[in-house]
Amino acid sequence: MKESVIRKLEGLLERNEEVLALLGDASVIADQDRFRALSKEYSQLEEVVAGFKAYQQAQADLESAKEMLEEDDAEMREMAQEEIKAAKVELERLEAELQILLLPKDPNDDTNAFIEIRAGAGGDEAAIFAGDLFRMYSRYAEANRWQLEIMSSNEGEHGGFKEIIVKVSGEGAYGKLKFESGGHRVQRVPETESQGRVHTSAVTVVVMHEVPEAEAISINPADLKVDTFRSSGAGGQHVNKTDSAIRITHIPTGIVVECQDQRSQHKNRAQAMSVLAARIQAVEDEKRRSAEESTRRSLVASGDRSERVRTYNFPQGRVSEHRINLTLYRLNEVMEGDLDAILGPLMQEHQADLLAALADEQG
């Protein structure tokens, strides 16, 4: 392992010990904000520190085995050779793990996420599939113990959604879901198809990270056009009595957000503003990412919603992830929320890309 990497790991080990000592300090325990921040830092350091300690132990085992080679006993020397071989394999494995753990973290990975699902080409069938994707993400959120809240929805005439925006709250939500952005294509026989022909429909998914209030971008009220209208969604007679639905247009960017799922206009406005902030931030993030990644690919899809990332073929029970040439014949499980079978390999490929970029930067 490079000396510069060893020095970095030694610094993290030292910092881990400092944080542990601070967490036992009475003044820190009394300051809940500082205690929470240090606890979070400690948990973030824990995995890499444990990996480095294991690496140091494997290094010590290797040196000890090398010393055994000086023994007169032939059997001891043979045993030493085996131990040297095992220690080298372990060191190689731990070094690879540590390289991944040291990769620069996306600061937004631990934030909540907004998922926008929009029916594209395919009419009613596209709307129905948008509903299927919403159900898939709901199941995945449930499996991860995340909370899911519908921010805005526009139902399809024959089921599903023309558009739905949901907020997913929970640790690591954006970090996992960000790979879902892009075009999702479905191939299946619609229920309304009497000839049994397979139709192809498309749905676009955009995943954005929530912008914490403390980091919220400044939105000038003068740049906003706010319209109120009567909700067209569920709500019984109430929807006919008040203009509780909100449409906010951000004039400089042309971004439009509608929220009508809450009975209160105040709540709809608050939800619309949080989605608007996320969309504006997503535009800024994309500009920055384009500048940084102009020379290499990214598995986190760009703002180009036409970019096809995945195909769901129902007659064959097949899911094809186009970014990494992954094909799985377990469509039912995926539609029931077993997304880790796809997101895991995507994450690994993303890490490999980051490692390659890091190696290029280091010469």
Swiss-Prot record:
The keyword Protein biosynthesis applies. The modification N5-methylglutamine is found at residue 237. It comes from the Bacteria. Keywords: Cytoplasm, Methylation, Protein biosynthesis. It is found in: Cytoplasm. Its main location: cytoplasm. Methylated by PrmC. Methylation increases the termination efficiency of RF1. GO terms for molecular function: translation release factor activity, codon specific. Residues 284-296 have a biased composition (Basic and acidic residues). Residues 284-306 are annotated as: Disordered. GO terms for cellular component: cytoplasm. The keyword Amino-acid biosynthesis does not apply. It holds the Pfam family PCRF. PANTHER family: LD18447P (PTHR43804:SF7). Belongs to the prokaryotic/mitochondrial release factor family. Peptide chain release factor 1 directs the termination of translation in response to the peptide chain termination codons UAG and UAA. This is Peptide chain release factor 1.
